[in-house]
């Protein structure tokens, strides 16, 4: 007995936690700073924490009411019908829902390179084939309609990330509209707005009002600080929103997740604090880090440091965990999550020391 051929599938390797790294290095986890996974520097919304505590005694019940309540809240927020909100177990769950709804075996998708690995992984799980469009470092990872269309060849799904991970680059609404107009009638353009709260540019949501070939992806993992409970959703055109009922898993978001999400949506103060601090950290990192950086609209900065693995390892030994971007095909770059003021300043100090030593 063996599984099907998985040789084309890659393994998603999430960043390691502070406790794991501390044990390996013999360090005190309380003395370490993790700025590697684009997590919220302030943790979860305090209101969400209270909602989780208050829901503990209801864990024997399936999340029917809370699921419906959260969908209604999100529908009001985005000015869509409840049917257009596809609630899921994290943003990756929303990607799976869209793949199940759209892909027949053997159909192609188009993904960015560098980019979020799970776009391709989800497509392959659903027996799709994967093609890539390239974001060029020489062009500062610019995201334009031409960036995508020059590599487009009739794929069923095209994935756009705005702001993009790991570069922080963005698509304009006009660029997304052009891509949707210039691709085939049966091509779905998925705009991943996981970092959408951190940008000053508006969401691409208005495109859904007059198009049936654009869908959005959103998550509670970043600005809301709820990565650990796995809660995300897609916003899809009304014309085919009813497909969710046919492809969704039973109770795709847990009772705890739904209750936390409802509370987090009302905690504007936590989101504003997170967004404002990230904006400060981006400016500080760009100004104070002794390495070239790219403008970013996310809660992170990409920097070119030479030997990314050496820099990341040396910083980690000094208690600062950042992301080596070799896995993105950028072995000369690191990604630094925006932290609190104290953590960001410490990270810059350590990284500048390490960069100087490695280059010496």
UniProtKB/Swiss-Prot annotation:
<dbReference type="GO" id="GO:0004400">
    <property type="term" value="F:histidinol-phosphate transaminase activity"/>
</dbReference>
<keyword id="KW-0028">Amino-acid biosynthesis</keyword>
<dbReference type="InterPro" id="IPR015421">
    <property type="entry name" value="PyrdxlP-dep_Trfase_major"/>
</dbReference>
<comment type="pathway">
    <text>Amino-acid biosynthesis; L-histidine biosynthesis; L-histidine from 5-phospho-alpha-D-ribose 1-diphosphate: step 7/9.</text>
</comment>
<dbReference type="InterPro" id="IPR015424">
    <property type="entry name" value="PyrdxlP-dep_Trfase"/>
</dbReference>
<keyword id="KW-0368">Histidine biosynthesis</keyword>
<dbReference type="Pfam" id="PF00155">
    <property type="entry name" value="Aminotran_1_2"/>
</dbReference>
<dbReference type="InterPro" id="IPR004839">
    <property type="entry name" value="Aminotransferase_I/II_large"/>
</dbReference>
<keyword id="KW-0808">Transferase</keyword>
<dbReference type="InterPro" id="IPR015422">
    <property type="entry name" value="PyrdxlP-dep_Trfase_small"/>
</dbReference>
<comment type="similarity">
    <text>Belongs to the class-II pyridoxal-phosphate-dependent aminotransferase family. Histidinol-phosphate aminotransferase subfamily.</text>
</comment>
<dbReference type="InterPro" id="IPR001917">
    <property type="entry name" value="Aminotrans_II_pyridoxalP_BS"/>
</dbReference>
<dbReference type="InterPro" id="IPR005861">
    <property type="entry name" value="HisP_aminotrans"/>
</dbReference>
<dbReference type="GO" id="GO:0030170">
    <property type="term" value="F:pyridoxal phosphate binding"/>
</dbReference>
<dbReference type="GO" id="GO:0000105">
    <property type="term" value="P:L-histidine biosynthetic process"/>
</dbReference>
<keyword id="KW-0663">Pyridoxal phosphate</keyword>
<protein>
    <recommendedName>
        <fullName>Histidinol-phosphate aminotransferase</fullName>
        <ecNumber>2.6.1.9</ecNumber>
    </recommendedName>
</protein>
<dbReference type="InterPro" id="IPR050106">
    <property type="entry name" value="HistidinolP_aminotransfase"/>
</dbReference>
<keyword id="KW-0032">Aminotransferase</keyword>
<feature type="modified residue" description="N6-(pyridoxal phosphate)lysine">
    <location>
        <position position="222"/>
    </location>
</feature>
